[in-house]
Amino acid sequence: MQEFLIPAKPDLQAARESWLKMLARERRLSPETVEAYERDTRQFLHFLTGHCGGSPGISDIANLRPADLRGFLAARRNAGAGARTLGRGLAGIRSLLRFLERRGLVNAAGAAALRAPRQPKSLPKPLTASDAKQVVSVEGQLAEEPWIAARNAAVLTLLYGSGLRISEALGLAGADLASETDTVLRVTGKGGKTRLVPVLPVALRAIAEYRRLCPYHLDPKGLLFRGARGGPLNPAIIQRDMAKLRSALNLPDTATPHALRHSFATHLLGRGGDLRTIQELLGHASLSTTQIYTGVDTARLLEIYESAHPRA
């Protein structure tokens, strides 16, 4: 239980709690990211307790030097944390310090000057086009209820057909894609940023079939995708069903819902999509994030989206 105690003085505890709420409500970070930042900063406060000789408060945070942060990263590295985990931890600490700085409580310049650990380059692991088609087809779904099979197919088709994150797909409203003529979708992604993505006819048909079979009233202002009891659809349900599909289709463990988004980008690039367009479709803030897909598939066949996508 000691791991979950927050070793900080009341002023810092309250400020940290306000920061975490801000990340979820205003920055609209995913619950998984907020949870990771909570865990990383909790570990940082545990480190400072030993480093400072007692529970730290805002005054202790204000007096932090880059050497203190380097000491924390070194301790985490010695405990077995990899570069990616260390980088995320530093990002969380920087975010907290910037939050405190905006309130006039600390100076975050020291943390900003600290270089993040070098991240290893790892290539995304997309599905093959044929495997992706099997995964998103309603015939391939394993759910016994027809409307749930149609729902799962519609969600997975949006991940592969439009490159959505699972949180973006499950955040769609009932009014979104209400007609098969709605070929463009406005998506709100990370950090509240919006982008326009094209929607393939196969995705529109999948959504229309889900609407037809869904036993619940889909209020235009409510969520489009519903759980078995009519509430919001939990991402874990899609991930669980994807795991069942993975087993049934004999796919690798890397075949996850997010791998469909990787497949979207990789297959477009391999069939002629340009990096700038794919960057915009994925909602990447930096082109360097998108450039990782150039190492996955270099075959170039067609030039435009409709003819590029295997589901077009």
From Swiss-Prot:
It holds the Pfam family Phage_integrase. InterPro entries: CB, DNA_brk_join_enz, Integrase-like_cat_sf, Integrase_catalytic, Integrase_recombinase_N, Integrase_SAM-like_N, Tyrosine_recombinase_XerC/XerD, Tyrosine_recombinase_XerCD. One of its GO terms (molecular function) is DNA binding. Keywords: Cell cycle, Cell division, Chromosome partition, Cytoplasm, DNA integration, DNA recombination, DNA-binding. The active site is at residues 165, 190, 258, 261, 284, 293. Residues 122-306 form the Tyr recombinase domain. Its main location: cytoplasm. It is found in: Cytoplasm. One of its GO terms (cellular component) is cytoplasm. The keyword Acetylation does not apply. The keyword Cytoplasm applies. Residues 10-101 form the Core-binding (CB) domain. PROSITE patterns: CB, TYR_RECOMBINASE. It comes from the Bacteria. One of its GO terms (biological process) is cell division. PANTHER family: PHAGE INTEGRASE-RELATED, TYROSINE RECOMBINASE XERD. Belongs to the 'phage' integrase family. XerC subfamily. Site-specific tyrosine recombinase, which acts by catalyzing the cutting and rejoining of the recombining DNA molecules. The XerC-XerD complex is essential to convert dimers of the bacterial chromosome into monomers to permit their segregation at cell division. It also contributes to the segregational stability of plasmids. Forms a cyclic heterotetrameric complex composed of two molecules of XerC and two molecules of XerD. This is Tyrosine recombinase XerC.
